[in-house]
Amino acid sequence: MPQTPSTRWCPTPEQLMILEEMYRSGVRTPNAAEIQQITAHLAYYGRIEGKNVFYWFQNHKARERQRLRRRLCARHQQQYAQQQATAAAPASSPNSSATVPSLAAGGSSAGVHPAVMQLHHHQHPYATNFMPHQLGYMGQQVATVPPVLNPAAAGMVDLAAARAGGGNKATAAGSGAYGGGAGLYNSCSSNQLEEWEATDAMEHCDASCGAASGSSDEGGALQLPPCCRRPLKTLDLFPTKSTGLKDECSSSKSSSCSTSTN
């Protein structure tokens, strides 16, 4: 059986060279007249038909669009990778700056008030795991306590002590609450200052420890320092028990009246 000749177009190198030169010169979609002229010119270099010229230009435009699309996709991917890298760079910067607060917290232990250090070691000589930043905070707070008490508070302290002491002393203190109690205030001012400083330090320590424990409830149990476990001591500024001043005053008045009648 005779074989039918193939209808597939096999362009020669000369035909391809001419077509590519025409495409680079700006010919993209030739019309029917131009296709006929190109086909007649290329027929000198081999077998060719008008439909072959038409499909060649169509396929060449499609391949060029595909190449352009690939270039654009590669460029977009590169830009996206650069944006991801720039967005990840600021996120890693807080890790490097996180060492600054730790250094500041470690350096705060150098500014601890000497009185607080002495008071802490005197009351808790076994406490070696005390937090340095809390100790520095206590030192700053205790350093702000005024060394001079309010005269009215001093007078009330003297009056309370005089009432607790007895009737005669209460009468003398009542006659001069601000003047007569100066000696008692001078004698107990140092003790009151130490007790008040210790109380103020423990209150601030308790507040800071409470805030720290509240923030660490989710992370785990926080071990409180010994100063926060100690209950607060309340100073008795006013007497809580009856001192019998009325009975003594009534007895003294009755004795004075009996002597006057005699």
UniProtKB/Swiss-Prot annotation:
Protein's name according to its UniProt entry: WUSCHEL-related homeobox 3A
Protein's cellular compartments: Nucleus
Native source species: Zea mays (Maize)
Sequence similarity: Belongs to the WUS homeobox family.
Keywords: Developmental protein, DNA-binding, Homeobox, Nucleus, Transcription, Transcription regulation
Region (Disordered): 83-106, 239-262
Function recorded in the entry: Probable transcription factor required to initiate organ founder cells in a lateral domain of shoot meristems. Involved in leaf formation.
Recorded superkingdom: Eukaryota
PROSITE patterns (UniProt xref): HOMEOBOX_2
Lineage of origin: Eukaryota, Viridiplantae, Streptophyta, Embryophyta, Tracheophyta
Compositionally biased intervals (Low complexity): 83-99, 251-262
One GO MF term attached to the UniProt entry: DNA-binding transcription factor activity
GO terms under cellular component: nucleus
Record-linked InterPro entries: HD, Homeodomain-like_sf, WUSCHEL-like
Gene3D superfamilies listed in its UniProt record: Homeodomain-like
Listed Pfam families: Homeodomain
Keyword Transcription assigned: yes
Record's keyword annotation contains DNA-binding: yes
Regions recorded as binding DNA: 4-68
Tissue and organ expression note: Predominantly expressed in tissues enriched for shoot meristems and young lateral organ primordia. First expressed in lateral domains of shoot meristems. It is then expressed in the margins of young lateral organ primordia. Not expressed in roots, seedling leaves or fully expanded coleoptiles. Also expressed in vegetative shoot apices (five leaf primordia and the SAM) and in the male inflorescence. Expressed at low level in the female inflorescence.
GO terms for biological process, alphabetical: plant organ development
